[in-house]
Amino acid sequence: MFQISNLLIAADFSAEVANNSAVGMIGSFIAAALLIVVPATAFLIFVSQKDSLDRTSTGRR
């Protein structure tokens, strides 16, 4: 662990570069949530509700 910290200190990263990288990473997480997680969740809720209605109407016949 000590060698890794020395390597990072010796690389002389600026705070601006680290900040921009962190902002980009957070932006990627948000984009992934909007493009993948939200539509998948909506689809699963829709299918779940439809299946529940089908089972309810089938049981009453």
Swiss-Prot record:
Transmembrane segments annotated in the record for this chain: 26-46
One GO CC term on file: photosystem II
Residues of the signal peptide: none
InterPro entries: PSII_PsbX, PSII_PsbX_type_2_subfam
Compartment annotation: Cellular thylakoid membrane
Top-level taxon in the UniProt lineage: Bacteria
Main location: membrane
Subunit structure and binding partners: PSII consists of a core antenna complex that captures photons, and an electron transfer chain that converts photonic excitation into a charge separation. PSII forms dimeric complexes.
UniProt similarity note: Belongs to the PsbX family. Type 2 subfamily.
Protein name, per record: Photosystem II reaction center X protein
